[in-house]
Amino acid sequence: MYKILLSLWYVISFMPAQSIIGPGNTKLNLFNYLIENYKTNSTLSYNDARDVMYSIIDLGQDNTLKGIYTNYTITIDPSQDPRPQTNALNMNCEHSWPQSMGASGSPQKSDLHHLYPTRGNVNSSRGNKPFSEIDDNQTDRWWRLDYYSNSIPNQ
């Protein structure tokens, strides 16, 4: 058994963990190689990006869509256009990098790495404030699921 494990370790330890991209290229040549070989040819429109986010990326197996921050959850019909459904149920799109700070143009506005479903009024309330921990005594609103309160919640 020891010989088998030792042999297996030997084989695994010398397997390449990654492949080299653009071998022999450095600096500007490597940069140009990466653009030529990996740059996307198209960018989703903002509407299409939200459709993909709502109906593919963040849609649960039970057709539920859970928002960040509050876990507010809605159920949508995947055979229908998701945006009218999400709008009607107070779910919209959070930009983790705010549009007001440079993410308003293309392709930034529709970059799926920075888009998340969220409860609409929570997103509006948050605005473009920086992420941080706020002392309860300095907080004036608490959100959870579809609930809102102006007083400190009980633990």
Language-model segments: what does each one mean?
Residues 9, 59-60, 85:
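A generic structural signal for short, solvent-exposed coil/turn residues
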Residues 18-74:
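N-terminal module-boundary/linker segments of secreted carbohydrate-active enzymes
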Residues 1-20:
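Bacterial Sec-dependent N-terminal signal peptides
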